[in-house]
Amino acid sequence: TDMTQTVTVAEGRAHVFIAVDHCNSECIGIHADRSANRFQALEPIRQGVAKHFGAVADDIATGLKLRHDHGSNYMSNNFQKEIAFLGIEASPSFVREPEGNGVAERFIRTLKENLLWVRDFETIEELRLALIDFARWYNDNWLVARHRYKTPAQIRENQMTPCDQAA
């Protein structure tokens, strides 16, 4: 998970938070807000947990590890308590080593080059809607070299067992 910034025409600075599955490069959550606090940073995590586990509940995501940097949002007690509540183990990257969170950093670069730097947004709400569309497009269309040029959606489909697909 990580954060970047952009600017909207009418509302000024907006913070964009993302969560990316390190295994298949799928964007599992994306969010924008004027505020850059720990509660906003949790939103993409909650989105991903709700999408892939069906709810946001105590220990529902046990076994997952969450890679994040040492930013104040991610190291805050509120953030750490929330992910622990979900059953997620924190996995902070090394200080001043952005490559330790390389999958998230690469997604942010792709997001900037294909959306944030090439399009203007009037409001944060317009930005949010564009981010949701971008995440959907990315998961279904972006070819990931380390997965032999398959999309994140194709990789996830191949990871699913027949029982998972039936559920």
Provide a role label for each language-model segment.
Residues 8, 12, 30-57:
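Active-site beta-loop-alpha junctions of metal-dependent nucleic acid enzymes
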Residues 16, 37, 41, 67, ...:
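Hydrophobic (often cysteine-bearing) scaffold residues that line and stabilize catalytic clefts
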Residues 62-70, 84-103, 119-123:
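RNase H-like polynucleotidyl transferase catalytic core
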Residues 26, 43-49, 81, 85-86:
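Retroviral integrase
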Residues 1-28, 36:
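An active-site-proximal beta-strand-loop segment
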Residues 4, 23, 31, 71, ...:
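Anionic group-transfer/hydrolysis microenvironments
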Residues 77, 84-88, 110-167:
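C-terminal domain-tail junction helix/linker
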Residues 6, 23, 52-53, 62:
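Secondary-structure boundary/capping micro-motif
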